[in-house]
A protein has these predicted regions:
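Sec-dependent signal peptide recognition
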Residues: 2-8
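Bacterial signal peptide processing site
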Residues: 17-19
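Active-site cleft segment of glycoside hydrolase catalytic domains centered on the general acid/base Glu
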Residues: 176-189, 219-227
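Active-site-proximal helices and loops of the catalytic beta/alpha 8
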Residues: 24-38, 52-58, 62-63, 69-88, ...
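Alpha-helical scaffold elements lining the catalytic groove of polysaccharide deacetylases
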Residues: 186-198
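Aromatic- and acidic-residue-enriched carbohydrate-binding clefts of CAZyme catalytic domains
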Residues: 32-36, 73-107, 138-185
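C-terminal motif of bacterial Sec signal peptides marking the signal peptidase cleavage site
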Residues: 12-15
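Boundary/entry segment of secreted carbohydrate-active catalytic domains
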Residues: 24-48, 178-188
Length: 501
C-alpha cells in the first residue's frame, strides 16, 4: 500500500516524554531502561512476526515487538481475542504457534535488531469455571492440574461474589476478581516461584521485555518480589489504568514504566476535534497543563491499544485505524514529541468488541505471509490484517524518533488552531497540519544547520546518500526554511537524512 506524497516544500531562500505479604523480603526490581519504538503485532502468529521483523521492522528501525500472551489458554466458543488472556498453564502453545516457532521468532527478530516483549498475564487464570484448553487440558474452577489449586487463589470475601465492585478500593482491586477471572494469590511463595519460573523460561529463549497485564490488580510488593527473581534484567512496562490525577501509578515506578492512558485519551480528543495547537506547551489550553501526566521517564505511551480501541479498559473515543488520516497523524506526533516511550498499534479489522483475529476455518489464525496469506489491507479499506505500522508516515517517523531521541524540544510554532511545528535541538524538525482544507505555509526557524535535507515521509535519503528519494529542502545559514505542508499531512527532517555536501 502506498500513500500519496504528503509534503511539498516550495522554496527555501534566505534560509531556509489484608493482601498476603511477600513470601520473602526482596529489593524492588529495577528494569533496564530502553528507548526506541515498540509495535504491538496483535494476535499475529510467531511465524508471521519473524517474517515481519526481517522484511519490515528491522529495516524500519523498530526496537521491539510486543507479542500476544504465549501460554496454553482457554478455548472459548466463538474464539474471541480475550481467550488469550485466560491462561490454563504456562506451556508455550496456543493460537500463535508452539514453543519451537516461538523460539525461532525470537532468534530471527533479534538477528535483525528487533527485541521481543511478551504480554505476560500474571494476575489471574481463566474466567470460565471449567473447560478445555487449546492443548486439550481439562480444568475446573480454581483447579489447574499440576499447577494451581483452591488455596493458590484469592477469595477476597469483600463482595457478595468476590468480584471487584469498588474500583478505587485497593483491597478489592488487588484481591477480588476482575470480571470473574480467578485471581492468583501472588503473595505466596508457590505462586511467586511459578510465575517467575514462567518469565525465566521466556528469558531463556531470548525474550528481553514484558508488558505486565492487569498490573493494577496486583499488589506492587508482590509484583516486585516476582520480578526480582527474573534473570536478565528485562524491560518492564505495566498496565495500570489510573484516573487523573494519578493515584496508583507511582506504586509501580520501581519495577518499570507504567502505561499512560490519559495520554491516549487526551491526544485522541485533540486529533478528533482538531485543535492540535494545544499539544505544545505554553499554548492556550495546552494538554500538558490540563492533565496530570506521569513523568516522561516513567510513561509508556500509545494512541490506542487492543483494549481501548474496542471500548474496553476504560476506553472508547480514542483515535483508531477507523478514523482515517487522524490516526497516522496522531502516531506521527507521538513519535516526534519528547514524552514517554512510544508503542504503535497494529490491528486486524473488527466489527464487534469480542471478534478474534482472521481465521482460515473459524479456528486457525489466517496468516499474513505465505502462499495463502492475507497480506495487509491497510487502513484505507480495512479487511483482515490492517497493519497500521506499515503506513509510510508511521515507518518514516520511526526513523525520525530514533534520530532525535533524547534531544529537547526547541523552535515551537503554531497557528493557534490546527497547525504546529517544532524542532528537536539540532537533530530534527517536524511539522503537522491537521487542517482539512488549508495548507501550512510558513517560513520557520528549524534549529538545524545549513544544508540540503530530505523530507522522510515522502521518501527520505536515496540509497547512495547523494540525493533525496522524495522532497528536499535547503536550510539557509540562519537555520530557516519555507515550508508548505498540505492539509491532513505531516513532514519531518533530520540530520541523518541530509544530502552529502
Amino acid at each position: 500500500m502506498k500513500n500519496p506524497v504528503l509534503l511539498m516544500v516550495l522554496l527555501a531562500l534566505t534560509a531556509c516524554q489484608p493482601p498476603d505479604p511477600p513470601a520473602e523480603s526482596a529489593a524492588p526490581a529495577v528494569a533496564t531502561e530502553a528507548s526506541g519504538v515498540v509495535v504491538h503485532l496483535f494476535e499475529w502468529t510467531w511465524a508471521d512476526v519473524a517474517e515481519e521483523c526481517e522484511a519490515v521492522l528491522g529495516p524500519a528501525g523498530f526496537a521491539a515487538v510486543q507479542v500476544s500472551p504465549p501460554v496454553e489458554h482457554a478455548l472459548v466458543e466463538g474464539r474471541p481475542w480475550w481467550e488469550r488472556y485466560q491462561p490454563v498453564s504456562y506451556t508455550i502453545t496456543g493460537r500463535s504457534g508452539d514453543r519451537a516457532a516461538f523460539a525461532d521468532m525470537v532468534s530471527r527478530c533479534q538477528a535483525v535488531g528487533v527485541d521481543i516483549y511478551v504480554d505476560a498475564v500474571l494476575n489471574h487464570m481463566t474466567g470460565v469455571y471449567e473447560g478445555v484448553s487449546t492443548a486439550g487440558t481439562t480444568f475446573g474452577e480454581y483447579d489447574y492440574p499440576g499447577l494451581y489449586g483452591f488455596d493458590d487463589f484469592h477469595h477476597c470475601g469483600l463482595t457478595e461474589n468476590d468480584d471487584i465492585e469498588i474500583w478505587d478500593d485497593p483491597a478489592q482491586v488487588r484481591t477480588c476478581e476482575l470480571v470473574n477471572l480467578a485471581d492468583l494469590r501472588t503473595g505466596t511463595e508457590k505462586v511467586q516461584a511459578t510465575l517467575a519460573g514462567y518469565l525465566n523460561d521466556l528469558v531463556s529463549l531470548g525474550v528481553t521485555g514484558f508488558r505486565v497485564d492487569a498490573a493494577r490488580h496486583m499488589d506492587p510488593a508482590d509484583l516486585s518480589a516476582i520480578l526480582a527473581r527474573v534473570e536478565g534484567n528485562p524491560v518492564i512496562y505495566q498496565e495500570v489504568l489510573d484516573p487523573d490525577p494519578p493515584s496508583w501509578s507511582a506504586d509501580y515506578y520501581p519495577m518499570g514504566r507504567v502505561t499512560e492512558f490519559q495520554y491516549s485519551y487526551m491526544v485522541s480528543d485533540i486529533f478528533q476535534e482538531g485543535t492540535v495547537a494545544r499539544l505544545l506547551p505554553g499554548t492556550e489550553g495546552a494538554v500538558w497543563d490540563a492533565a496530570s501526566f506521569l513523568p516522561s521517564e516513567q510513561a509508556f505511551v500509545f494512541i490506542d491499544n487492543h483494549d481501548n480501541q474496542r471500548g474496553h479498559g476504560g476506553g472508547g473515543g480514542v483515535v483508531t485505524y477507523k478514523d482515517g488520516r487522524r490516526h497516522p497523524l496522531a502516531m506521527a506526533f507521538m513519535l516526534a514529541y519528547p514524552y514517554g516511550r512510544p508503542r504503535v498499534m497494529s490491528s486486524y479489522a473488527f466489527e464487534d468488541d469480542r471478534q478474534g483475529p482472521p481465521t482460515v476455518d473459524g479456528e486457525a489464525i489466517h496468516r499474513v505471509y505465505g502462499p495463502d496469506g492475507l497480506g495487509c489491507s491497510g487502513p484505507e479499506a480495512p479487511e483482515g490484517w490492517v497493519c497500521e505500522h506499515r503506513q509510510p508516515m508511521v515507518e518514516a517517523m520511526v526513523g525520525f524518533h530514533n534520530a532525535v531521541d533524547g534531544a529537547p524540544l526547541v523552535e515551537t510554532w503554531t497557528n493557534g488552531r490546527d497547525q504546529l511545528a517544532f524542532g528537536r535541538a539540532a537533530r530534527g524538525f517536524f511539522l503537522l497540519n491537521r487542517s482539512e482544507t488549508e495548507p501550512l505555509v510558513q517560513t520557520l526557524p528549524t534549529g538545524l544547520s545549513a544544508g540540503v535535507y530530505c523530507e522522510v515521509v515522502s521518501g527520505g535519503l536515496s540509497v547512495d546518500g547523494q540525493a533525496c528519494a522524495g522532497t528536499e529542502v535547503a536550510i539557509g545559514a540562519d537555520g530557516r526554511a519555507r515550508f508548505e505542508v498540505p492539509p491532513m499531512s505531516a513532514a519531518a527532517f533530520y540530520v541523518d537524512a541530509q544530502v552529502a555536501p
